[in-house]
Curated annotation (Swiss-Prot):
Region (Disordered): 293-329
Protein name per its UniProtKB record: Clavesin-2
CDD domains linked to this entry: SEC14
Assigned GO CC terms: clathrin-coated vesicle; early endosome membrane; endosome; trans-Golgi network
Comp. bias intervals (Basic and acidic residues): 308-319
Gene: clvs2
Topology relative to the membrane: Peripheral membrane protein
MF terms in GO: phosphatidylinositol bisphosphate binding; phosphatidylinositol-3,5-bisphosphate binding
Organism: Danio rerio (Zebrafish)
Presence of keyword Membrane: yes
Length: 329
């Protein structure tokens, strides 16, 4: 075992070896193989390239060097293309703070039977008069950045439960294709986390309609890990034991305290001074904007072509992407 595997239990070490093909004897070589590909993408500012950081991308892609580098490139490309989203990315940002206090996300104290961290979202808590969908997404990304520091979670991953109880048609009507695609790109395509399951409970018909719209943007692996339980909490409990769930989800624990995770982040001051935020690396947002200008951009010869996440040029459909998916008319 190398120092990079410190903090992993014997069980998780074995899991990393069997499921992820992690080999302590070749770990540094694996990391260097990914690092050597960085030169092929001069159009991207790779703001962090240390061993521990690259390792989480290898674990997320089961030590496939090419796929790990693709994910690393998309991680920074997403941040470059959405600069405003990552400015002031800290728990004390007003929008993020309010989203966190309303349980976006909630983080349960117990792990599931596979050692995965359980995130919960109570969708009806979204107060659209106080913060936006983007604030919720920023709060989730900040939270994931904090949690992914734990090597156990890099190996074991996460489970997400979304409770749609009392989520109104009016709330759903505020969602647009561009919003949902932004979330999919940020969570599915650009973050080194292993999601073992995404569970919908108490979802109304219009959530099924929204899912139909976003389904084409989901990878096959993601689709297979989405479970629509409806009002049947017994089917949820077959996968996640009720002993570790709050009463809102039919569990045996007390109701979830929405402010628990918010207090954790605020108490530890997870903000732009930590390792999770672009400002803390070495390249400022202003520098990124300069580097991305046409005069300084270089043509990439990478096997991972640029523009994987690139927004299309202004075309007729752009206006449609800004329209609500569900109309109140």
């Amino acid at each position: 075992m190398t120092h990079l595997q410190a903090g992993l239990s014997p069980e998780t070490l074995e899991k990393a070896k069997v499921e992820l093909k992690e080999n302590p004897d070749t770990l540094h070589q694996d990391i260097q193989e990914v690092r050597d590909m960085i030169i092929t993408r001069p159009d991207i500012g790779f703001l962090r390239t240390d061993d521990a950081f690259i390792l989480r991308f290898l674990r997320a892609r089961k030590f496939n060097h090419f796929e790990a580098f693709r994910l690393l490139a998309q991680y920074f490309e997403y941040r470059q293309q959405n600069l405003d989203m990552f400015k002031n990315l800290k728990a004390t940002d007003p929008g993020i703070k309010q989203a966190l206090k309303d349980g976006f996300p909630g983080v349960l104290s117990n792990l599931d039977r596979y050692g995965r961290k359980i995130l919960v979202l109570f969708a009806a808590n979204w107060d659209q008069s106080r913060y936006t969908f983007v604030d919720i997404l920023r709060a989730i990304l900040l939270s994931l950045e904090a949690m992914i520091e734990d090597p156990e979670l890099q190996v074991n991953g996460f489970v997400l439960i979304i409770d749609w109880s009392n989520f109104t048609f009016k709330q759903a009507s505020k969602l647009t294709p561009s919003m949902l695609r932004l979330a999919i790109e940020g969570l599915q395509d650009s973050f080194p986390a292993r999601f073992g399951g995404i569970h919908f409970v108490n979802q109304p018909w219009y959530i099924h309609a929204l899912y139909t719209v976003i389904r084409p943007f989901l990878k096959d692996k993601t689709r297979k890990r989405i479970f629509m339980h409806g009002n049947n909490l017994n089917s949820l409990h077959q996968l996640i034991l009720p002993e570790i769930l709050p009463s809102e989800l039919g569990g045996m624990l007390p109701p979830y305290d929405m402010g628990t995770w918010a207090r954790t982040l605020l108490d530890h001051a997870y903000d732009e001074e930590t390792d999770y935020c672009p400002e803390s690396y070495t390249l400022s947002v202003k520098d990124l904007e300069k580097d991305l200008s046409p005069k300084t951009m270089k043509r990439s010869q990478s096997v991972v072509e640029p523009g994987v996440l690139k927004r299309p040029e202004k075309v007729k459909s752009e206006e449609e992407n800004m329209q609500p998916l569900l109309s109140l008319d």
